[in-house]
């Protein structure tokens, strides 16, 4: 069993983190997610560093069957497949 969280900039995911008793793993999502975040920040007028950084948050931790590595890779694939932009 692994515990995982997703790092979001507003509603856009950017990274997954999973940990179990033996390991922890953090994976960034495809670069298109950061490109989207940067575009949205510019469109929303969040140009100061403080305004930009204030938009980041981790989701509440959740549990999922599997090792930290397996869960992190599965979440990354699911989030990337779900992106419809």
Regions found by a protein language model. Name each.
Residues 21-58:
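Acidic, aromatic-enriched beta-alpha/helix-loop junctions
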Residues 1-24:
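Short, charged/polar N-terminal "headpieces" of proteins
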Residues 45-85:
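Acidic, low-complexity intrinsically disordered segments
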């Amino acid at each position: 069993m692994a515990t995982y969280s997703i790092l979001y900039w507003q509603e856009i995911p950017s990274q997954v983190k999973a940990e179990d008793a033996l390991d922890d793993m953090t994976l960034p999502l495809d670069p298109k997610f950061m490109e989207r975040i940067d575009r949205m920040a510019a469109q929303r007028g969040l140009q100061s560093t403080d305004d930009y950084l204030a938009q980041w948050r981790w989701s509440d931790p959740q549990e999922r069957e599997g090792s930290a590595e397996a869960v992190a890779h599965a979440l990354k694939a699911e989030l990337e497949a779900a992106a419809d932009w």
